[in-house]
A protein has these predicted regions:
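Intrinsic disorder at enzyme termini
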Residues: 15-18
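Mature-region segments of soluble proteins
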Residues: 1-13, 26-33, 43-50, 54-194
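Functionally engaged cysteine thiol sites
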Residues: 20-21, 178
Length: 194
């Protein structure tokens, strides 16, 4: 991936007015306090790792952003979005059933070539599944839940912020320049071709 924000590192703002103590504590958690496995079993964890690696590939990253540990923590603490679709099982059961159905749909998913994994995930996303295990959970909704959780966790990490030029929460510094094509001096400068 091309570096759209060359030289930008949001963590350079650590001791600046851009970050307050609460922000620094949250970022310390995301960077240094990666949760241990508490909810998923080893097979579920390995499958989720393989799925996340296809949804959010990180081939050029020396230290990939950890996503599975944070999903596992969310499940262990039973912290969801505060709603569920009619007919869906509770969140933890949804994840267990969804991962079991995915495993049944494609035994050995983690060993498949990337193209095969992507094709299978596309079928799940479209609801074009074969396994009877999907009767317990809607494949389209499970895929949407999986993608939302994975992307939300990924883009909560400072390394992902660097990729998109995000400077972190606006408090306490706030935004001043709000006009078209204006940016505050603390915002990342995007590289332009030519």
């Amino acid at each position: 991936m091309a570096d759209r924000y060359p030289g930008y590192d949001v963590l350079d703002k650590w001791d600046s007015p851009s970050f307050d103590d609460v922000t620094r504590d949250v970022l310390t958690d995301r960077l240094d306090r990666i949760p241990a496995r508490r909810f998923l079993d080893e097979r579920e964890w390995a499958l989720l790792e393989a799925v996340v690696a296809r949804l959010l590939p990180q081939p050029d990253r020396a230290d990939p952003i950890p996503v599975t540990p944070w999903i596992d923590r969310m499940l262990a603490e039973d912290r969801g979005e505060g709603f569920r679709h009619e007919g869906d099982p509770p969140m933890r059961a949804l994840w267990r059933e969804g991962l079991a159905a995915l495993s049944d749909e494609a035994p050995g998913f983690a060993t498949f070539a990337a193209e095969e994994q992507d094709a299978l995930l596309g079928r799940v996303q479209r609801g074009e599944v074969q396994s009877d295990r999907w009767r317990a959970v809607n494949p389209k909704r499970f895929f949407a839940q999986l993608l939302r959780a994975a992307a939300g966790i990924y883009y909560a990490h400072p390394a992902a912020w660097n990729e998109i030029g995000f400077g972190g929460p606006a408090n306490p510094r706030g935004y001043v320049r709000l006009g078209f094509d204006e940016r505050d001096r603390w915002e990342a400068q995007e590289a332009h071709d030519g």
